[in-house]
Curated annotation (Swiss-Prot):
NCBIfam families: polc (TIGR00594), PRK05672.1 (NF004225)
UniProt cross-references to CDD domains, sorted A to Z: DnaE_OBF, PHP_PolIIIA_DnaE2
Provenance organism: Ralstonia pickettii (strain 12J)
Protein name: Error-prone DNA polymerase
GO molecular function: 3'-5' exonuclease activity; DNA-directed DNA polymerase activity; nucleic acid binding
């Protein structure tokens, strides 16, 4: 009887070569999964070494703190020779903060030397960098690990090792990775021989690419996606086994048995002990040039704040505001944030000096300092602000100041930042693009070799809210067996891939600006957009590392408002009408206009800011805003937070009761609560109100209240509200004898704020823009809609819908025409001089040439310049004097923009085709050309005209597509939107229209809201879940939708509750329409 082989002693181990899914389409595990598994296996440390990247390190850091595992920051590189050919692979590990800065600069240099998504690191970049990079020679303060190829050529490995030893000296080790393949013994012998020959120690590494072997199928799919091949064609490019998964220490002990194995494993822990850098050591330094010489940041911020206060309050600063300013300045100084406020102030000051509309949003609107600096527009003297919502001692993260700028002029602001601070000190934050259901379905389906047509149909039929059960049904509808191994494998891999990083994009506007070289704090790489650079961390990473960003955001409505005001200002008599002594501005508009609020209460808000969506339009006739603060509530109440917290219906009921004279409809359990909730009729609509109650009635400090805010936001993920709720119960019920039912309801409402909700200050800022845009639509509709058209792309509605709404607002819209149009849509005096009820003449809108698909701006500018010299006499004259080529003439003819020179579309196209190559013919030949009788072509039928309009302009002024089908629809007994408006509540009805909007709010329990449009207006349709499941294809895909259902109307709220749907899209023929789906 033989004795069993004794088990080896479990070795101490640190994994020093590990990539995550931030090595895009290669790593098959999240950083947090790798950290958790390393801790489970008893590793001493884990080095995250993604390919020329530290993008995943911030998330790994959070996980390492949670699991109490040492995290080492590193990166893997392929080093190329002088010819640019791959030569060797190595890992660099940061030993300290200097080493991390050097590593970050090396990554930056390699990334900026290549297009987005790639990198290029030459041997000379490490061995003998020149100029500003000379200090990176040999990657000081970084450990280097040479990664030999599997079963390498001994001479080639020797050459690689000699070079690495010369560059990195005694900081070099040679990795021994054993993937349990056919040549492991020979591989081990070769690496050992080279190690001994040049006296460089070996170290065990795993080349980890997944935390568990069960991820091997996903790893294969990622490889196939990366190679753009189906799995069946990948062959040897797939990993031969799952040995790139993390190994237990028992597995490692067996694997590295034999000569030197124990030493090789021990070396991992020795190297880990030499790496003592944490991302927490990164110290961000603010830019200093925003502070004038001779002043400290605190002195300058105080001076500018009180100078701004004097401008904001010409009659004197109230004691309340003065005290708030002093409190804020004290806390800002304590936390050292003055340079950040001054940096944002500098950017805003530039924008205002250049006439660029801007406005701060979010919790920054709680700050009196921000208001006085002109960053935000919410007056702390008249609004309800809570500074703790914006900044507190307890918050272990920087303040968040988001500023919206006109979206068409934001580039000027961005270039100002680059020019002021330089490209080495500033870059945009990254936006991490991850796999969602449809993208995962498509990529996995292709990798599995499923027919592309089937893949596309299944992906199109799969909505974001669908479960795996619905996926199986969609696959079955395409002829696949839902229970087949292929479909089950497809579903499983999609589940795994969903949420995986795909690539880094650029954040919508978050700039990180540093005092010194930004690339020593975080690597920088090229963005897809020219002259853009992004760092490798996204906004969440920046918050976890306490790095500040300046958010330079784009808001289309600011562009539209500025353009509207400019056009109105140019109209005769308008300045006098609005009492403006200089150029018309928002401040000149009355802030309590009755007609504007009447229009809002009728939900005629297409095109205006924030209150134009289907959900907002449904709420407006119920809430019926009559003043500014009503709009603040309106903007905020249609959000998941208030809805899930059960706050909407109680508020509306109390508002209605109060409107009907019932002044006793609201009671308060105590004066502290009344002081906070009186403005919202006893219902906490805003998160700040819960914080205020906690402070005034629950004995919370400002820092305690901020912790409550954070825990409310994280309740769904962490469920950590109990301690706060218990504290409130004790303070309010036990101590102050409040009604327990009220406190219990408050605690439930706190859970509702785990869903998204607007801060009151944010809603207040947006309400201002909602009112201004509503006023302009009500009183200056021509300028407003022309500005919206010129500000595209933006907003909730398409240009076609905006033009329809302009016409419903009694604005005449004239077609694009080369004899009258310029690039933008413009205002033209009405020939009849008709005035509105306010005595103002409303001009017509002339569509601009920018509405024509394929039209190029330089050609439009040449047309305008030539027309200014003399009117065009013919298409030939136009082509010659404006130097238009065949493309220009064809798109103009297709858009019917040559009608005044050539007649209808067919005639115009014929004339353009009859010309020689425009812009290049000679005058002598033109004079000698024979005169021929023009060929008269028949005009196209109206249906063809409308289709051509939509194809070229995306809209038609001649007829609505549904109007062309009206005779047929009447035979099918479909009523128009105008007819439905007269139906009684509960009447059976049927309607047909083009689908313009589909929405499925997360708070609507699966209900979908659809808007359809016919020639007389829009119809709001409600689809209940049972109908959605029964008629899914019609719900998701129909462009022209017939609806059978029951009409519901209450005051101004009208909608059609669907009972049956019909997809009538084929009736549209080749007409292409578009809808805004599930945004």
């Amino acid at each position: 009887m033989t004795s069993a082989t004794p088990l080896p002693v479990l070795p101490d181990y640190a994994e020093l070569h590990c990539i995550s899914n931030f090595t895009f389409l290669t790593g098959a595990s999240h950083p947090s999964e790798l950290v958790e598994r390393a801790k489970l296996y008893g590793y001493q440390a884990l080095a995250l070494t993604d390919e020329c990247s530290v993008a995943g390190t911030a998330r790994a850091l959070v996980a390492s703190k949670e699991h109490e595992l040492k995290l080492i920051i590193g990166s893997r590189f392929t080093v190329r020779n002088a010819d640019g050919e791959p030569w060797l692979r190595l890992v660099l590990l940061a030993q300290n903060i200097e080493g991390y800065g050097n590593l970050s600069e090396i990554i930056t240099h390699a990334r900026l030397a290549a297009p987005k998504g790639e990198y290029r690191l030459l041997a000379d970049d490490l061995a003998s960098p020149q100029g500003e990079l000379a200090h990176l020679r040999g990657a000081p303060d970084c450990l280097a690990i040479l990664l030999p190829d599997y079963d390498p050529d001994p001479q080639q490995l020797l050459a690689q090792a000699w070079w690495c030893q010369r560059v990195f000296g005694d900081r070099l080790s040679i990795a021994l990775e054993l993937p349990l393949r056919h040549a492991d013994d020979r591989h081990r012998g070769t690496v050992l021989a080279v190690s001994e020959q040049i006296d460089v120690p070996m170290v065990a590494t795993g080349g980890v690419q997944m935390h568990t072997r069960q991820r091997k199928p996903l790893h294969d799919v990622l490889t196939a996606i990366r190679l753009s091949k189906p799995l069946s064609e990948c062959g040897l490019e797939l990993a031969p086994s799952a040995e790139q998964a993390m190994r237990t220490r028992m597995q490692l002990a067996f694997l590295y048995q034999g000569e030197g194995g124990e030493k090789i494993l021990r070396r991992t822990v020795e190297l880990a002990a030499l790496c003592n850098f944490s991302l927490d050591e990164i110290e961000y330094e603010y830019p200093s040039e925003v502070v004038p010489e001779g002043m400290t940041p605190a002195e300058y911020l105080r001076a500018e704040t009180f100078a701004g206060a004097a401008r904001r309050y010409p009659n004197g600063v109230s004691e309340k505001v003065h005290a708030q300013i002093e409190e804020e300045l004290g806390l800002i100084a304590e936390l050292g944030y003055e340079p950040f406020f001054l940096t944002v102030y500098d950017v805003v000051k530039f924008a205002r000096n250049e006439g660029i509309l801007c406005q701060g949003r979010g919790s920054a609107a709680n700050s009196a300092v921000c208001y006085c600096l002109g960053i935000t527009e919410v007056n702390p003297d008249s609004g309800n602000t809570l500074f703790a919502r914006f900044l507190s001692r307890a918050r272990n993260e920087p303040p968040d100041i988001d500023v919206d700028f006109e979206h068409q002029r934001r580039e000027e602001v961005i270039q100002y930042i680059y020019k002021k601070y330089g490209v080495t000190r500033t870059a945009l934050a990254a936006a991490l693009i991850t796999y969602r259901t449809r993208s995962a379905l498509r990529d996995v389906g292709r990798a599995l070799g499923i027919d592309l047509g089937i893949v596309e149909q299944v992906a199109k039929g799969q909505a974001w809210w669908d479960s795996r059960k619905e996926f199986a049904q969609r696959a079955g509808q395409q002829g696949l067996d839902p229970e087949s191994p292929l479909v089950l494998r497809w579903a499983q891999l999609v589940d795994q891939l969903r949420g995986f990083p795909r690539h880094l994009s650029q954040h919508v506007g978050g700039f990180v600006i540093a005092q010194g070289k930004l690339s020593r704090l975080v690597p920088i790489e090229n963005a897809a957009m020219e002259n853009r650079r992004v760092i490798q961390w996204d906004k969440d990473d920046l918050e976890s590392l306490r790095l500040l960003k300046v958010d330079v955001l784009a808001l289309g409505m600011l562009t539209a408002i500025r353009r509207t005001l400019d056009m109105v200002d140019a109209l005769p008599g308008r300045r006098e009408h609005y009492g403006a002594t200089a150029k018309l501005a928002m401040q000149n508009l009355p802030d309590d206009d009755t007609e504007t609020y009447d229009m809002i209460c009728r939900a005629e808000t297409i095109g205006v800011f924030q209150i134009e969506s289907r959900a907002q339009q449904s709420m407006l006739p119920r809430l019926r805003p009559r003043e500014y603060y009503d709009l603040v509530i309106q903007v905020a109440i249609v959000r998941p937070g208030p809805i899930q917290g059960g706050m909407v219906h109680p508020y509306l009921q109390r508002r209605e009761a109060k409107r009907n004279g019932n002044t006793d409809c609201v009671t308060y359990p105590g004066p502290e609560v009344k002081a906070v909730l009186e403005r919202t009729l006893g219902v906490p609509i805003f998160q700040e109100q819960v914080m205020e109650i906690a402070m005034k009635a629950g004995d919370f400090t400002a820092d305690d209240a901020d912790r409550l805010r954070r825990d409310m936001a994280a309740w769904k993920r962490k469920g950590n509200l109990t301690q706060h709720q218990e504290r409130l119960v004790h303070a309010m019920v036990v101590k102050r004898r409040y009604d327990p039912a009220f406190v219990e309801a408050l605690c439930k409402q706190m859970e509702g704020f785990a869903e998204y909700g607007f801060p009151e200050s944010h809603a207040a800022g947006f309400a201002k823009l909602a009112y201004v845009s509503s006023f302009l639509k009500c009183h200056e509709p021509a300028a407003f809609f022309a500005a919206l058209l010129n500000s595209q792309p933006m907003g909730f509605y398409s240009p076609s819908q905006l033009v329809q709404e302009a016409r419903r607002s009694h604005v005449r819209v004239l077609p694009a025409d080369v004899t009258a149009s310029v690039w933008d849509s413009t205002l033209h005096p009405r020939a009849d001089g008709e005035t509105g009820e306010d005595g103002l003449v409303q001009p017509d809108i002339r569509l601009g040439l920018n509405r024509i698909r394929g039209m190029r701006k330089p050609a439009a500018e040449r047309i305008e310049a030539a027309r200014a010299q003399a009117p065009f006499t013919s298409v030939e004259d136009l082509a010659h004097r404006a130097a238009l080529d065949r493309h220009d003439l064809n798109v103009l003819a297709a858009a019917n923009a040559l009608k005044s020179l050539a007649g209808h579309r067919r005639q115009a196209l014929w004339q353009t085709l009859a010309l020689q190559e425009p812009g290049h013919d000679h005058a002598l030949l033109r004079q000698a050309r024979p005169v021929e009788a023009p060929l008269e072509l028949p005009a196209p039928p109206i249906g063809e005209e409308v289709m051509a309009d939509y194809g070229s302009l995306g809209l038609s002024l001649q007829s609505h597509p549904v109007e062309l089908l009206r005779a047929r629809l009447e035979r099918m007994r479909f009523a128009t939107a105008a007819t439905l408006a007269g139906y009684r509540n509960g009447q059976l009805a049927r309607a047909c229209g083009i689908v313009t909007v589909r929405q499925r709010p997360g708070t609507a329990n699966g209900t979908i809201f659809v808007s359809i449009e016919d020639e007389t207006g829009a119809i709001n349709v409600i689809l209940w879940p049972h109908l959605i499941e029964r008629q899914r294809r019609e719900v998701l895909n129909a462009q022209l939708l017939g609806v059978y259902g029951k009409w519901q109307c209450e005051r101004e709220t009208r909608h059609l509750v669907a009972q049956h749907l019909v997809d009538l899209t084929p009736l549209l023929g080749r007409l292409a329409t578009s809808s805004r789906d599930f945004h």
